[in-house]
Amino acid sequence: MKIMMSNRQGKTLAVTVTGPEHADVIVFSNSLGTDQGMWQSQVAALEQQFKVVTYDTRGHGQSDVIEQSSLQNLAEDVIDILDGLKIAKAYFCGISMGGITALWLGIHYPERFYSITVANSAAKIWTEEGWISRANTVLENGLAEIVATTHTRWFSHQFDYFNHALAQQTIQSLTTTPALGYAESCRALAHADVRDEIENISIPTLIIVGQNDPVTTVADGEWMQQKIPLSELFVIDASHLSNIEQSEKFTQILSHFILKIQ
């Protein structure tokens, strides 16, 4: 079921809900420059046993572009979706930008989540200067330059992304992401830093990192695992979009983690 929902700012978010009506809920949050379609392997594997909620992050897919966004805004969109769907509590899984969103939610809204999964992310991703520069470049020149090199960051060199349908679909979603939506997310990430707060996360936390990830590294994952009390760390032989490159392994790790909590 596809739903267009309003957030607290009156802007529209594109949401999809599948699975049994009264099952436990798991929410998936996409990475920068993608849309909710990136989770289709996980949705297919889990929708028989969970009520699965995916959504296009603001400025991506079919969701509205919202200017002057922050990490708090990205996270509060999730709370607005839960409230709109009358979901009291859920499991949450985010990758990259969705992963740091998970951290913020774990810090500020632990009562709304059974657990968070932080995939291919960090408590501080890249640098403020780097993100601001990228935002300005995209606004001036569009996304073509980003699209041309994105496979080198998203996928391992040995992964045949060219002949992988979902990988190609995900790259295509980057080409259709609004430049302003992408830039606003870059600006939000420029100021997103929860390093001083993640020790306060009190709910079970799964950290998944890609062995070959040049963006959010194994060291980033190890640092988070040391700081977050109830956390587990798994390293997957993949790059930045590990849920696509190693979809079965990713889903297996996530499912096992959730089953231990249920």
Positions of predicted regions on the chain:
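Conserved HGGG/HGGXW glycine-rich cap/lid loop of the alpha/beta-hydrolase fold
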Residues: 11-64
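Active-site loop/oxyanion-hole signature of alpha/beta-hydrolase fold enzymes
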Residues: 37-44, 53-93, 252
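Flexible "cap/lid" loop of the alpha/beta hydrolase fold
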Residues: 100-108, 113-145
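Conserved alpha/beta-hydrolase catalytic His-Asp/Glu region
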Residues: 126-129, 141-199
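Short beta-strand/loop motif that positions the catalytic acidic residue
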Residues: 201, 207-209
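Acidic catalytic loop of the alpha/beta-hydrolase fold
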Residues: 211-216
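Catalytic histidine neighborhood in serine/cysteine hydrolases
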Residues: 218-241
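Catalytic histidine-centered segment of alpha/beta-hydrolase-like enzymes
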Residues: 238-251
